[in-house]
Amino acid sequence: MVARPMDIIFDSNSHVTLTTLDLGYSHIGRHGAKYLVDALQNNQTLTTLCLRYNELEAVGTEYIADLLRNNTTLITLDIGDNRIKSQGAKYLADALRTNKTLMVLDVKRNSLEDEGVQHLTDALKINMTLTLLDLRSNRIGIRGAQYVADTLRNNTTLNTLYLAFNQIQDSGARHLAAALQDNKTLTRLDLGHNEIRDQGAQYLGDA
């Protein structure tokens, strides 16, 4: 049998100390994602995985989510720029409900929109380990901001949240500001480039 390239590169017997794997901008696609996950199933050392800009889409993201369900070492996952959309977000959210180790999740520039954000924020009402979530450039509107706000009211682990380059506007800022009055753990919130004007700034300032 001819070995697949991913199996050769990630043979767990020869890479027992691998902790960081950066495959960003490698165009591995959905099929490459499956090979990668198969090769990493038994890995017990990897803590950081970067898959940015790899054309994974929702199908490839489902394979990554399967890895998250069983993995007990991965701390950081960068899956930005992969067009995973709301369905891909749902796969990740389902995995986050059971994963106990992931602390950093980067899903920027994935066209998640409000529906995708709802999937992730619902999972964060259960997940108690994630500390950083990057949602920049995901076409998140006022409704999506409300989903985020609802989660922030009760979440006690998230300390960093990136929401820049969306369409949250003043009304979305009002939802977030109200949630910040209850939240005791968030220390960094990036809301740049969100069409937030004077009124939105006042809401946030009052919080």
Language-model features: locations:
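Leucine-rich tandem repeat or coiled-coil scaffolds
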Residues: 1-207
